[in-house]
A protein has these predicted regions:
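Generic structural signal for well-ordered alpha-helices
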Residues: 37-41, 64-68, 98-102, 131, ...
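Active-site-adjacent pocket scaffolds in enzyme catalytic domains
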Residues: 111, 118-236, 240-244, 249, ...
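Active-site beta->alpha N-cap acidic-glycine motif
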Residues: 1-75
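Short acidic/His/Gly/Ser-rich catalytic and metal-binding motifs that mark active-site loops
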Residues: 11-16, 184-186, 257-263
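Metal-dependent polysaccharide deacetylase catalytic core of the NodB/CE4 family, i.e.
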Residues: 47-127, 139, 144-152, 171-183
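Conserved, mostly hydrophobic/aromatic
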Residues: 7, 44, 79, 116, ...
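The substrate-binding groove and active-site-proximal loops of carbohydrate-active enzymes
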Residues: 24-31, 54-56, 82-94, 119-122, ...
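C-terminal domain-boundary segment and adjacent tail
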Residues: 46-48, 198-232, 243-314
Length: 314
């Protein structure tokens, strides 16, 4: 079960960088969202691939035509309104931010917004209150868990990086964590962001194939259908399932933009992480989507037997 996601931001939406931290600063930068989104849509069309797009509310407010173009064929999710880290907000601020983004996206697209991803995977164990708010706002699927250490968040103790039910009090949230692979004792997220750009394609393909085939027994209970497409039910009253592997990839439009300007004032390490491999990443994605079949979050969720997935209590 391979899932493709995009975090739709402008090229300057880097987290924890003072020069681009607030909305008041964003208007002075070059607009690249049109060509960057068109590049993605062209690749998806040519490879017949479905994906989920997590869109910042600011992008939707500023460029509603871009959002409408995406929503014509693809699932839309919220990436908050103003791209701020969750752990830097109070619960009240977080609710207001997410609620405004959901309303805006629903008004523009006519779609129910049922999917969410936090900027920088910034829901940690200490921000578990966020799940109460997300559920209250109608979110059914979350893609915010980074099951390793991360500069902006992460849940290193999450458990196996597979679809799970997060339980927080009376709330249950269907969670799609980012895929990880352990290399020399360290968990790395190779299928998205900087690692996607950095890792040579042969290695990316090899690691992805391992995960898609059930790396380290990280499996998903996929619902079994008969030849007519009907769900096959077992004697226990639950759907019959077959365990399959799991791979989730996340890409930003700027990851594929080889012509973007370089932001001034970035530390050397951050500059490397932000721009390494951007010139060849679009071509790499084309190969990736030809070698692996991906679906969007909703399609994946509809094909999982959630009664049989791990339960993670936070």
């Amino acid at each position: 079960m391979n899932i493709l996601t995009f975090d739709v931001e402008e090229w300057f939406h880097l987290l924890a960088f003072d020069n681009t931290r607030t909305e008041a600063q964003w208007g002075k930068y070059e607009v690249r969202i049109y060509e960057n989104v068109d590049r993605i849509l062209d690749i998806l069309e040519r490879t017949n691939t479905k994906a989920t797009f997590f869109i910042i509310g600011w992008v939707a407010k500023t460029y509603p035509d871009v959002v409408k173009k995406i929503a014509a064929k693809y699932q839309i999710g919220s990436h908050t309104m103003n791209h701020q880290l969750v752990w830097q907000q109070t619960p009240e601020e977080f609710r207001k931010d997410v609620e405004s983004s959901i309303k805006l996206l629903q008004d523009i697209t006519g779609q129910p917004i049922e999917c969410f991803r936090a900027p920088g995977f910034s829901i940690r164990e200490s921000e578990s209150w966020a799940y109460d708010i997300l559920a209250d706002l109608g979110i059914k699927y979350d893609c915010s868990v980074f099951p390793a250490h991360h500069a902006h968040g992460g849940m290193a103790g999450f458990g196996a990086p597979v679809p799970s039910l997060i339980k927080h009090g009376d709330v249950e949230m269907k969670e799609f964590p980012v895929t990880t692979k352990t290399i020399l004792g360290k968990k790395i997220v190779f299928s998205g962001g900087g690692y996607f750009r950095l890792v040579p394609y042969r290695l990316l393909k090899s690691w992805s194939a391992e995960c898609a085939n059930g790396y380290a027994n990280h499996m998903v209970p996929r619902i079994w259908h008969d030849k007519a497409g009907n769900v096959v039910m077992g004697d226990d009253g639950f759907p019959v399932t077959r365990n399959v592997g799991y791979l989730l990839s996340y890409i930003h439009p700027r990851d594929l933009d080889g012509g973007q300007p370089m932001l001034e004032g970035l530390p050397l390490k951050r500059k490397f992480k932000s721009y390494v491999g951007v010139k060849g990443a679009a071509e790499k994605l084309r190969y990736y989507l030809k070698d692996f079949k991906f679906v969007d979050v909703k399609t994946a969720a509809d094909n999982i037997c959630w009664e049989k997935v791990p339960v993670v209590t936070i």
